[in-house]
Curated annotation (Swiss-Prot):
Keywords: Acetylation, Anion exchange, Blood group antigen, Cell membrane, Disease variant, Elliptocytosis, Glycoprotein, Hereditary hemolytic anemia, Ion transport, Lipoprotein, Membrane, Palmitate, Phosphoprotein, Transmembrane, Transmembrane helix, Transport
Intramembrane region residues: 839-869
Residue numbers bearing the Phosphoserine modification: S185, S350
Substitution effect: S613F: In DRTA1; markedly increased red cell sulfate transport but almost normal red cell iodide transport
Protein name: Band 3 anion transport protein
Result after altering R760Q: In SPH4; Prague II; induces abnormal cations sodium and potassium fluxes; decreases anion chloride transport
Source species of the chain: Homo sapiens
DNA-binding is among the record's keywords: no
Length: 911
């Protein structure tokens, strides 16, 4: 039950994040328009803009108690609110921050006593004694108390205020009741306290034990003001009394734990009554003051009526759970979208308008800082990129002097090296070593250095990727079939690539990335994942065919240059190495976001999961000396992978025979296909890294980066090296590693970004280190290919994370009652959701068929046809609101660890 409650609190807390709702503290002009399908706001017009006189509020609830040691009455801190609620346990430790849960009767009773209570606005007092005297005088004037009760209540209000750090010295406390003589009698709480009270007074496992005042103080904004809520029982009173005081200026009354000036004071006192729990009334009042809309109304109210009006609005947007058992965790989590709708109503000040965010992708006239805005001039976008980004060049160097940058270099080096080795080994397999590990490492190093020095967004990590591997395999097969020199054909493709990118940049073609929606991205990513998984098992089957399991073997097999017959245990060991690498990498990825060990240790282990997995399985293979496994082919030093087939410079007219003239011109077609792949990956990666929530300040440059990446790839082909693209997962990981999260965040709330170390040195050093890795031939040559197959399988499986298409395919096999509460399930009929999924599956099947035929070179062209399919045909089948839900880019940037989520969940692009 505790886990269920924690999950519910996490989901509800997510709804309070400012980026999802119109926050009253943010000017309306800065907020996004509400979605078209949202219910219109209620007629009540709440304050939705910040007022110059409003502040963040720290709320403290204190109860009237008696200490066990001195038998003296005092006010004891019981709970506090800094956006979320924290309760003080009996052992003096604070419970974990959580969303406040209120009983229905406490809200009704609070409204009743508030209706009859005393309200003092803009009181000109600077001491607690002055406030208490004026409040009691008003109580008497409004006939809330008798004159003879004044002295007893004044004495009570001026009692000593104690806090969490004093609890142990007091020997504990117990609830007390104020009587006429001042002697304690019955407990403040009823003898049979409710389950609600027990729940909130318990110290949870995730408690924040040892929170010092200074520790909590740095979580509170500097200009915050405090609200003090005092609750207690006084038997001599005839009825409950409530006093609400707003001081004209916040004053240091020395009544709360923190040195925060007090602006508001709630006093709730009264006699014992059958259905009144003053602690719960105090919690309700404190929660009310911590709520954003009521807080602003409390600052701006000019009468009791305005406060009651805001209280009614608070009640209108509160949920009531009936006293029934939740049949499942899913049933409780279904409250989240209901609460989201209530929050929208409360935070919106005008009727809902059509959502413009869905059409943002088609807005070709962005703001003045929009890097995709067209200028209408040749190379106008490129010039704007240079003018926008290069003035920061000096700071790109100086900002790198930070320990965090050094840590990011080490981390990203391994993140870039592992796929470079993996793809290099597989590229050598596909091309008969005409390009392999050495070419890919050198290409990654040289292009990485140039991009780090000249790129507009130096946080992008350029590297080889799955789609490029698929193209290389298809083009190699095409050349083999037609008797063409593969490595020479790539040179002509490189020439055409340079021409294409110059034309596209000249006419500002980068704006076309706006038309590529999640629909196309997910089909692309899913296809590459399937290819990764298929190729892994295809290679494993090939090993079993070459080294079948049989009863007897010929042990006199010639081993040079490769085994000339089947060998014992080779297939089984290859299976173990592949599966072991995959499972170790998967487990370490999950371990990163688990709850074991301190967060820093988890992140270190998880971030280096792939290199650790490779190292473990290489050691396993190393210690099994009597079983053969095929190793990675790496030349010694600065040499090409196959020196008998090529050198470092490729002659454009042919190496062994004259290259056909018709193919020189026909290479424009495969060049266009390569350009499509690089354009898709690089531009979408730039969009993801440049999301506004990442709070980067130096900007990016789509045109400049595209020119560099494609241009460098075209030149690299002349030297027989692979062309590269901006890699999505590695780039997002790089940006996350350089993101500095602020410490002054609300307890229990998500950390806020303080800054991002936008600089060029980390990318530069990573590229240099990758290049130097070519000298690691003695180590690299010991890596079995089966280990790389395991990493290949890992990349295929992890690429499925965050792909909504994969989630919807799984829903095809689940009854509707087990479907999650997400927009594309809740707002779209099930059969129409499955229809959308079916259309994507058909597109995927067509792409797979194309990939499996001799026409596999045309794969990128067929892929790009899904863009007009999405933009032209699907709107004829699905309503606008359905497409918003099914094709929305709702992935959130991942900065901090969250169980079950990482960078792979943020992107819908292949690895």
């Amino acid at each position: 039950m505790e886990e269920l409650q924690d999950d519910y609190e996490d989901m509800m807390e997510e709804n309070l994040e400012q980026e999802e709702y119109e926050d009253p503290d943010i000017p309306e002009s800065q907020m996004e328009e509400p979605a078209a399908h949202d219910t219109e706001a209620t007629a009540t017009d709440y304050h939705t803009t910040s007022h110059p006189g409003t502040h963040k509020v720290y709320v403290e609830l204190q109860e009237l108690v008696m200490d066990e040691k001195n038998q003296e009455l005092r006010w004891m801190e019981a709970a506090r609110w800094v956006q979320l609620e924290e309760n003080l346990g009996e052992n003096g430790a604070w419970g974990r921050p959580h969303l406040s849960h209120l009983t229905f009767w406490s809200l009704l009773e609070l409204r009743r006593v508030f209706t009859k209570g005393t309200v003092l606005l803009d009181l000109q007092e600077t001491s607690l004694a002055g406030v208490a005297n004026q409040l009691l005088d008003r109580f008497i004037f409004e006939d809330q108390i008798r004159p003879q009760d004044r002295e007893e209540l004044l004495r009570a209000l001026l009692l000593k205020h104690s806090h969490a750090g004093e609890l142990e010295a007091l020997g504990g406390v117990k609830p007390a009741v104020l009587t006429r003589s001042g002697d304690p009698s019955q407990p403040l709480l009823p003898q049979h306290s409710s389950l609600e009270t027990q729940l909130f007074c318990e110290q949870g496992d995730g408690g924040t034990e040892g929170h010092s005042p200074s520790g909590i103080l740095e979580k509170i904004p500097p200009d915050s003001e405090a609200t003090l809520v005092l609750v207690g029982r006084a038997d001599f009173l005839e009825q409950p009394v409530l006093g609400f005081v707003r001081l004209q200026e916040a004053a240091e009354l020395e009544a709360v734990e923190l040195p925060v000036p007090i602006r508001f004071l709630f006093v709730l006192l009264g006699p014992e009554a059958p259905h009144i729990d003053y602690t719960q009334l105090g919690r309700a009042a404190a929660t009310l003051m911590s709520e954003r809309v009521f807080r602003i109304d409390a600052y701006m109210a000019q009468s009791r009526g305005e406060l009651l009006h805001s209280l009614e609005g608070f009640l209108d947007c509160s949920l009531v759970l009936p006293p029934t058992d939740a049949p499942s965790e899913q049933a409780l989590l279904s409250l989240v979208p209901v609460q989201r709708e209530l929050l929208r109503r409360r935070y919106q000040s005008s009727p809902a308008k059509p959502d413009s965010s869905f059409y943002k992708g088609l807005d070709l006239n962005g703001g003045p800082d929009d890097p995709l805005q067209q200028t209408g001039q040749l190379f106008g976008g490129l010039v704007r990129d240079i003018r926008r980004r290069y003035p920061y060049y000096l700071s790109d160097i100086t900002d790198a002097f930070s320990p965090q940058v050094l840590a990011a270099v080490i981390f990203i080096y391994f993140a870039a090296l592992s796929p470079a080795i993996t793809f290099g080994g597989l590229l050598g397999e596909k091309t008969r070593n005409q390009m392999g590990v050495s070419e890919l490492l050198i290409s990654t190093a040289v292009q990485g250095i140039l991009f780090a020095l000249l790129g507009a967004q130096p946080l992008l990590v350029v590297g080889f990727s799955g789609p490029l591997l698929v193209f290389e395999e298809a083009f190699f097969s095409f050349c083999e079939t037609n008797g063409l020199e593969y490595i020479v054909g790539r040179v002509w493709i490189g020439f055409w690539l340079i021409l294409l990118v110059v034309l596209v940049v000249a006419f500002e073609g980068s704006f076309l990335v706006r038309f590529i929606s999640r629909y196309t991205q997910e089909i692309f990513s899913f296809l590459i994942s399937l290819i990764f998984i298929y190729e892994t098992f295809s290679k494993l089957i090939k090993i079993f065919q070459d080294h079948p399991l049989q009863k007897t073997y010929n042990y006199n097999v010639l081993m040079v240059p490769k085994p000339q017959g089947p060998l014992p245990n080779t297939a089984l060991l290859s299976l173990v190495l592949m599966a072991g690498t995959f499972f170790f990498a998967m487990m370490l990825r999950k371990f990163k976001n688990s709850s074991y060990f301190p967060g820093k240790l988890r992140r270190v282990i998880g971030d280096f999961g792939v290199p650790i997995s490779i190292l473990i399985m290489v050691l396993v293979d190393f210690f099994i000396q009597d079983t053969y496994t095929q190793k990675l082919s790496v030349p010694d030093g600065f040499k090409v992978s196959n020196s008998s087939a090529r050198g470092w410079v490729i002659h454009p007219l042919g190496l062994r025979s004259e290259f056909p003239i018709w193919m020189m011109f026909a290479s424009a077609l495969p060049a266009l296909l390569v350009f499509i792949l690089i354009f898709l990956e690089s531009q979408i990666t730039t969009l993801i890294v440049s999301k506004p929530e990442r709070k980067m300040v130096k900007g990016s440059g789509f045109h400049l980066d595209l020119l560099l990446v494609v241009g460098m790839g075209g030149v690299a082909a002349l030297f027989g090296m692979p062309w590269l693209s901006a890699t999505t997962v590695r780039s997002v990981t790089h940006a996350n590693a350089l993101t500095v999260m602020g410490k002054a965040s609300t307890p229990g709330a998500a950390a806020q970004i303080q800054e991002v170390k936008e600089q060029r040195i980390s990318g530069l050093l990573v590229a240099v280190l990758v290049g130097l890795s070519i000298l690691m031939e003695p180590i690299l040559s010991r890596i079995p290919l089966a280990v790389l197959f395991g990493i290949f399988l890992y990349m295929g499986v992890t690429s499925l994370s965050g792909i909504q298409l994969f989630d919807r395919i799984l829903l095809l096999f689940k009854p509707p009652k087990y479907h999650p509460d997400v927009p594309y399930v809740k707002r779209v009929k099930t059969w129409r959701m499955h229809l959308f999924t079916g259309i994507q599956i058909i597109c995927l099947a067509v792409l797979w068929v194309v990939k499996s035929t001799p026409a596999s070179l045309a794969l990128p062209f067929v892929l790009i046809l899904t863009v007009p399919l999405r933009r032209v045909l699907l709107p004829l089948i699905f309503r606008n609101v359905e497409l918003q839900c099914l094709d929305a880019d709702d992935a959130k940037a991942t900065f901090d660890e969250e169980e079950g989520r990482d960078e792979y969940d943020e992107v819908a692009m292949p690895v």
